[in-house]
A protein has these predicted regions:
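Glycine-rich phosphate-binding loops of nucleotide-dependent enzymes
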Residues: 2-253
Length: 253
């Protein structure tokens, strides 16, 4: 099975504090790998290393078999590695169409123009409608982001990442701040969109263990900067002590 994204013996220190310690993980083609752990476990540092926002103190990160050393997040996105952030990264005054257009233009390396003109470009408009349709936002194209529900804002944020045509996408808490009733709907939409768009691998950072159990192929658990476990869901949730370490309490699954 082809490994798309991996870390090899990666460590990251901030001064005397070691946030990650000798972490080696891989995301293979066709996998959704969830990264879990208590606050301060190193999840955010790991995602920032995977996307080129941080450089490791030791070890290396590889994307499609090549080291990303010296490659920034924008160039990585051009090569097919996209990220949707935990905190919604959209401008409230822009419409849904304008938000997706900005992502499409950055991917196609077209010269920036007024967003209103971009949405009038037939090729760009077709791509906007395609992406919006996948995420159930086509009826909201002319709506400013500020007027969207929290769930719709999450979908728009992820839709913008999908507009980059990624091979691998990192989803950082994609359902945070969303009602429990909407969480599974959002996850199902994301996975269906990934399959439709030809996304080859997904990294999911998630606190909700119900979602992790339902959608993961593998679960990587971090604790104090180390890999505590790298297991399929069945084996992970069969270990009450492991679950207690990750979420701070025992729970039956």
């Amino acid at each position: 099975m082809t490994v798309l994204l991996e870390t090899r013996n990666v460590s990251k220190s901030y001064g005397a504090f070691r946030a990650l310690d000798d972490v080696s993980i891989g995301i293979a083609q066709g996998e959704l790998v969830s990264v879990v752990g208590p606050n301060g476990a190193g999840k955010t540092t790991l995602v920032n290393l995977l996307t080129g926002l941080l450089k490791p103190t030791a070890g290396e990160v590889l994307f499609m078999g090549k080291s990303i050393a010296g490659i920034g997040p924008v160039e990585l996105a051009d090569h097919g590695l996209a990220r949707a952030f935990q905190l919604i990264q959209i401008f409230p005054q822009l419409t849904v169409a304008e938000t997706i257009a900005a992502a499409v233009v950055s991917r196609q390396k077209k010269r920036w123009r007024l967003l209103s003109r971009l949405t009038a470009d037939k090729a760009i408009d077709a791509r906007i409608r395609e992406v919006a349709g996948v995420f159930g936002l086509r009826h909201r194209l002319d709506t400013v982001a500020a007027a969207l529900s929290q769930g719709e804002k999450k979908l728009l944020d992820v839709a913008s990442a999908f507009a980059l045509d990624p091979k691998v996408i990192l989803l950082d808490e994609p359902t945070s701040g969303v009602s429990t009733a909407d969480k599974h709907g959002i996850m199902k939409t994301l996975i269906a969109a990934a399959e439709r768009a030809g996304v080859q691998g997904i990294v999911l950072v998630e606190h909700d263990m119900d979602l992790v159990a339902a959608y993961s192929h593998r679960i990587v658990a971090l604790s104090e900067g180390k890999v505590l476990a790298d297991l399929p869901p069945g084996r992970f949730f069969a270990d009450p002590g492991l679950i207690e370490t990750v979420i701070g309490k025992r729970r039956a699954y």
